[in-house]
């Protein structure tokens, strides 16, 4: 999942000596390392699945512990991602105000912070939730840091497709936190998030593809035309909507979720096809309106998972 960061073009962050790093600013910098806005979306997909697994209101203490563990785990992954990507972050407009680039946090501090969060989150999950959730959480962190950030991101245009698996695991964690087991319901929702991730991220990549091209990151919009990217977005979008409708036939949800999934999915497909039509017409610049789909993708996943949480009470 993705949050947009920006700065005036051409402004490069500069290192700061310890004496010029106020305590309050330092605290904010460490919080920024965790990418809170992204984690909000991850938790939006975790908590509703707990309602689905419980078929009602789950234990609130369990929800709190799962949210705290999830935040720490995702925060650790994000901090380690920033540590690894600090070289290219300094060259990209949208990331050059990150704490490592500005010097508000040193690389060693960031590395220690990320590893500490990873360890604490795993132990918290294991001792207060269950060890299945702990291993899933650790697996998500390692997949994001090692497989996506270190291996895929700078090597293949399919980076976000397979790297996005890390962002799909919170639905499994939400289910396992309640049941200490797996079922087809979280697997289906894993599929929804898997096919959601590329058409969520590619519109943003279309907007900032010059940034990625500058640092040699082969995002699909960097190496392919807008027509090709838009066609891929439409394909993934259709599969995502179809997968989202599998819960009711298998008996996991009722009419309410299905109605919301159809309505929200229909709006998504409208936006996706609109982007494809503009790309086919070779519209460029602001008229391409690629960010409309990016913003709608966040609304879509929020509405869909809210429906998952509400549906058990209407059956």
UniProtKB/Swiss-Prot annotation:
It is found in: Cell membrane. It is an enzyme of class 2 (transferase). GO terms for cellular component: plasma membrane. Its EC number is 2.5.1.141. Pfam families: UbiA. It catalyses: heme b + (2E,6E)-farnesyl diphosphate + H2O = Fe(II)-heme o + diphosphate. It comes from the Bacteria. GO terms for molecular function: protoheme IX farnesyltransferase activity. It is a multi-pass membrane protein. Signal peptide: none annotated. Keywords: Cell membrane, Heme biosynthesis, Membrane, Transferase, Transmembrane, Transmembrane helix. The chain crosses the membrane at residues 38-58, 62-82, 111-131, 132-152, 159-179, 184-204, 233-253, 255-275, 293-313. The keyword Nuclease does not apply. Pathway: Porphyrin-containing compound metabolism; heme O biosynthesis; heme O from protoheme: step 1/1. One of its GO terms (biological process) is heme O biosynthetic process. Carbon 2 of the heme B porphyrin ring is defined according to the Fischer nomenclature. Converts heme B (protoheme IX) to heme O by substitution of the vinyl group on carbon 2 of heme B porphyrin ring with a hydroxyethyl farnesyl side group. Belongs to the UbiA prenyltransferase family. Protoheme IX farnesyltransferase subfamily. This is Protoheme IX farnesyltransferase. It comes from Streptomyces coelicolor (strain ATCC BAA-471 / A3(2) / M145). The lineage of its organism: Bacteria, Bacillati, Actinomycetota, Actinomycetes, Kitasatosporales. The gene is ctaB.
